[in-house]
Structure formats: C-alpha cells, structure tokens
Regions:
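Active-site-proximal acidic segments at structured loop/helix or strand boundaries
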Residues: 164-213
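Active-site proximal helix-loop segment of RNase H-like, two-metal nucleases, encompassing DDE(D)
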Residues: 123-131, 142-164, 178-186
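Retroviral integrase
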Residues: 1-149, 196-342
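Extended, charge-rich low-complexity interaction segments
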Residues: 157-171, 297-308
C-alpha cells in the first residue's frame, strides 16, 4: 500500500477514472466573507488621486493603475488602443472605487490620454493632470515595473517556455491582484489590505490557495447525457479562483483555448504532453517567449532608467529593503524602458 501511495503522489489521480466516474456534487452554499472597514477610515481618505499608464505583455495590452492613498493596483486588459477601450478600462476601475465609497478626485497620466480624458472629465467630473512632454508619472512607472517583475518571476516558475494569450492575460491580472492582498507600506492602514479597503472578499485558503496558476487540472464537465460515453471531465489549465462568493475556478480549456468556469477541479501533475499542448497553442499565436513592450508594441531592450522616476521609492513601498536588494544590482537589469515610454 505504501508503494501505491507513493505512485499516487508522483502520478496523481487516475485520469481515466476521473473522466469516466466523476459525478455531480451538491454546490457549496453562498457565504459572504467581507471584512467591514471602519467608516471613519473611508471618510478620512475618501478623495483619491489615481495614476494610470499602459503596458503590453507580448501582444496583450493592459491599463495599469495605482492610487496614491490606498496603494491599490489594477491591470485591466484592453483589446485595442482606441479611446473607447481606454474609457471602458478606466470605467472598471472607477466603479470599483465608487462602490467602496471612494471618489477619484484627480487622475495623473501622460499626454497620450489627453483626448480621452476630456470625455472623462465631462462625464465623470474628474480633474485631469497631464505630464509635460517627455515626462512621466513616477508612481505609474514604478507600478509598471513592480507588476512586470511579479509577472516575470511567476513565469519562471511555470514548466512552459511559452504561454498563449489567455494565460498571459490572466497571469498579469493574477499577479497584480496578489499585490493587493496584504497591507502595504505607505498605505492608510497597517491592518487592512488595499483589497479589503475596496470591499473585496477576504482571502480564503480553501477557495484561493488550493491550485496554483498554470497547473494542469481535470475540470468536472456536467452533462445531461448520464447514460452516454461523454467524458465527465475536461483537460484544462488553471488560471485563477472564480470571483463569486461560493467559490469556483476559472480555467483555460486545452481543447479550445477558451476560458471556462467550473465548480470543482482535480489537480494532475503536468506531463510533457500538456507542456507541448500549451506551447503549441502559444506558438500558433506567435508567442515564443515573454516580452514587455511599449504602447507602440515595440520591444524595449535594457537601457537607462527613466529620468525623474525614483525607483528606490518603489522598493520602500513594495517590500522592506535589504542591503542585497539595493547594493547588488536589483536595478542593473534596467527594465523600465521595457514598459510604456510615454
């Protein structure tokens, strides 16, 4: 029996049994688990200054934001560089703050957004502050660098050398969301995280920490044809926990490449066949690596840091600085020009 247990740990559950014997289970009850933030804390910091920028990971665009008070970060996927798409992404962020009782008073951004922000100013009554030519918003540039570092670190943990567009999009969103899960240095509270301040659900180990991003899973595939030979599970790549209250999972179907949501999954060790399937999907979309690009979708190679942006402040805010981080060349990489050079 010990040999069988060892084999199960190495090879995981029997996939044929999962595909043939899995049955539907009773859904989990809906339980609201949101920490109540003192109203005085929200009232005191109600007016927010927001810094925004655009970043590309391969061909996938994101509007990145960070505020100067709560330090909440977001990366909203955009499908094009049109003003309508920028407006849609910004509306997602503003609704999040407004829903928690905060008001965006000023938006700091590069001149690229000037035409768009005239509409935002009129519709949403937000004050705009545009940088001078060749200048940048320091908080936005540091935020891009921080998100980029987290994406690159997470990518290095994956067994895949290339990932498709869907996985890139969720990788950026997941890494950005994780930066909001714990109290930040320079924020408004040493006890409440940015996510808690905006009324997002609390971190639950059983819901949010069971399966890592990029894992190979068998997702329960419910069908009304119970007497047929239709498979009971689907091959999928794990993306992130679902955002609903009862729990669930957002996945990439390995057969179609589309995002699906399932209530229950079973993690299976990643095999060479799975790795080849993911990399083939990425190669078909023209992705062979992970590259960070500017708003013109041009790859920026390592160069000097952007003038006027104090990257030491980013280290102070994101993590406790140690001597190795500052003295041994954390900045020798000189990545910021990989981001939007606006």
């Amino acid at each position: 029996s010990e040999d069988i247990n060892i084999a199960e740990k190495i090879f995981g559950p029997d996939m044929s049994s999962l595909k043939g014997k899995s049955t539907r289970r009773k859904p989990n009850p809906v339980k609201e688990d949101i920490i109540e933030v003192p109203k005085e804390l929200i009232t005191q910091h109600r007016e927010i200054d927001l810094c925004i920028d655009i970043m590309y990971v391969n061909e996938c665009g994101f509007m990145t934001t960070i505020d100067r008070t709560i330090k909440f970060r977001s990366a909203i996927p955009i499908t094009s560089r049109t003003h309508e798409e920028y407006y849609r992404a910004l509306d997602v962020v503003l609704r999040l703050y407004n829903g928690a009782g905060f008001v965006i008073k000023t938006i700091h951004c590069d001149g690229e957004f000037r035409a768009l922000m005239e509409r935002v100013k009129d519709d949403l009554h937000v004050k705009m502050n545009f940088t001078n030519a060749l200048d940048h918003v320091p908080e936005a540039e540091r935020n891009n660098r921080t998100i980029k570092e987290r994406i690159r670190a997470a990518f290095q943990r994956l067994p895949y050398k290339a990932i498709p567009r869907v996985m890139i999009r969720y990788l950026a969103m997941t890494q950005t969301q994780q930066l909001n899960l714990f109290p930040v240095k320079g924020g408004v509270s040493p006890y409440f995280s940015p996510a808690t301040m905006l009324g997002l659900p609390s971190l639950d180990y059983n819901k949010h920490c069971q399966v890592p991003y990029g894992a190979f899973v068998q997702a329960n595939h419910e069908t009304n044809q119970t007497s047929s030979n239709v498979t009971r599970t689907l091959d999928a790549i794990y993306l992130r926990p679902a955002t609903n209250m009862q729990g669930g999972h957002e996945l990439m179907d390995l057969n179609s490449g589309h995002v699906i949501t399932r209530a229950r999954v079973t993690q299976i060790p990643v095999t060479e066949i799975v790795i080849r399937a993911v990399e083939t999907m990425a190669h078909q979309q023209g992705f062979k690596d992970l590259k960070f690009k500017n708003r013109h979708k041009q790859v920026f190679h390592d160069a000097d840091w952007i003038a006027g942006v104090d990257y030491a402040d980013a280290a102070d805010e994101d993590e406790e600085e140690d001597e190795a981080y500052t003295d041994n060349g954390a900045g020798d990489d000189n990545d910021d020009d990989d981001m939007d050079d606006q």
